[in-house]
A protein has these predicted regions:
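Conserved small/polar residues in nucleotide/adenosyl-binding loops
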Residues: 4-13, 220-227
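N-terminal capping segment at the start of a domain
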Residues: 19-60
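TRNA-binding/sensing appendages of the translation machinery
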Residues: 48-89, 94-96
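Flexible, glycine/proline-enriched loop segments at strand-loop-helix junctions
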Residues: 56-57, 150-151, 180-181, 213-222
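Acidic/His- and Gly-rich active-site-bordering loop/insert found
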Residues: 78, 82-128
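A generic, well-ordered mixed alpha/beta core segment in the N-terminal half of proteins
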Residues: 113-198
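Residues forming anionic-ligand binding surfaces in small-molecule and nucleic-acid pockets
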Residues: 188-191, 195-219
């Protein structure tokens, strides 16, 4: 028999215990296993679209530009085009190319309630310092500072690209994207070979690579120091 401690209730049949367990216990189920073929296709299609968006959207400005394209393809228009708003209007407003607000105008005023969905557009990255370029040992490097919660050791010896915008004195904007195309040069942060890294490997994981070490190689040449002198 099965008896509950501190209770007068006694369950003699184990099947009763299983029945109670099935009724009262939270059951963990794999949400993937009961999906149909059509549902799986929809899941993969959605994931592919999201991956493509992420591949094209690596900075706030790129995210906003791509979000604008998606919004306009779904009937949204800049609020600057409207003198008055009507029920059902779909509008957006872009703030300095780095944040975006979208709204669908409802039937009642905001005092009756409002539904808000928020998402952030920033992500962990390395930002170039104001005067980033320096030369050491025939190599040109970029000085950086990291943004967001990063595991610094994950950023070494992998191909990196540079994304951003340069504003010239006359106000002209030049958008920069180097390293994503297969024909582009890539940037990388060097690390020590295992047989040279005994001291480094004795450190704690978070200390093995410091923030000051996250300086990508931007150029290398036998006469790099002469080239830099002419920049």
């Amino acid at each position: 028999s099965e008896c509950l401690v501190g209770s007068e209730m006694c369950i003699r049949d184990r099947s009763e215990v299983e029945e109670l367990k099935n009724r009262l216990f939270y059951k963990r189920e794999n949400a993937w296993e009961d999906k149909t073929g059509e549902q799986l296709n929809n899941i993969f299609a959605y994931a592919e679209g999201y991956i493509n968006f992420l591949n094209k959207s690596k900075t706030e400005r790129e995210i906003v530009a791509n979000a604008k394209e998606i919004a306009e393809s779904n009937g949204f228009r800049c609020i600057c085009e409207y003198e008055t708003l009507s029920v059902g209007d779909k509008v957006y407003y872009i703030n300095r190319e780095k944040s975006m607000y979208l709204a669908v105008i409802g039937k009642q005023g905001m005092e009756s309630g409002i539904n808000i969905v928020g998402a952030h557009a920033d992500s962990p990255r390395l930002d170039l310092k104001p005067n980033p370029l320096y030369e050491e040992g025939g190599f040109a490097y970029f000085k950086t500072h990291y943004y967001g919660g990063i595991k610094k050791y994950q950023w070494t010896t992998i191909p990196l690209s540079i994304h951003g915008v340069v504003v010239k004195a006359n106000g002209e904007k030049i958008y920069v994207n180097v390293g994503d195309d297969e024909k582009d040069p890539v940037f990388t942060i060097t690390d020590l070979l295992p047989h040279l890294a005994q001291e480094q490997m004795e450190k704690k994981l978070k200390e093995g690579i410091s923030g000051e070490d996250l300086n990508p190689v931007s150029y290398t040449h036998l006469r790099a120091h002469e080239t830099l002198a002419n920049l």
